[in-house]
From Swiss-Prot:
This is Basic phospholipase A2 homolog 7. SMART domains: PA2c (SM00085). The record marks 127, 130 as: Hydrophobic membrane-disruption site (MDiS). It comes from Craspedocephalus gramineus. Disulfide bonds join 42-131, 44-60, 59-111, 65-138, 66-104, 91-102. Expressed by the venom gland. InterPro entries: PLipase_A2, PLipase_A2_Asp_AS, PLipase_A2_dom, PLipase_A2_dom_sf, PLipase_A2_His_AS. Coiled coil: none annotated. Residues 121-133 are annotated as: Important for membrane-damaging activities in eukaryotes and bacteria. Keywords: Disulfide bond, Secreted, Signal.
Amino acid sequence: MRTLWLMAVLLVGVEGGVIELTKMIVQEMGKNALTSYSLYGCNCGPGGRRKPMDATDSCCYVHKCCYKKLTDCDPIKDRYSYSWVNKAIVCGEKNPHLKELCECDKAVAICFRENMDTYDKKKKINLKLFCKKTSEKC
């Protein structure tokens, strides 16, 4: 159980309603979010923003920027509700701050699907030793 929780925490940027984000990625991609994206490239998983290696990695970069813009919510602890309607993610929160969090997670799940042709299994477990800092602002 402890190992499962650790893997969940490593998921895309460490933050977010991990359960919700994991489900969104499975629904959009049909892939195991933990094994496919938690350490992908230079931006997925723990750590700061780095120069993206490809479009899939850019999804994680943008996701971290999205979290950075959130106000009045804690992406690590706060949970939100959403539904899967006609193969689409629908954020269902009345709380505008939790809806923003849901929209950040929805965007990264859709970004992964739209850029699945750039996914490179060789980048699936990247220790980030050779990742370059970026001067790009969110």
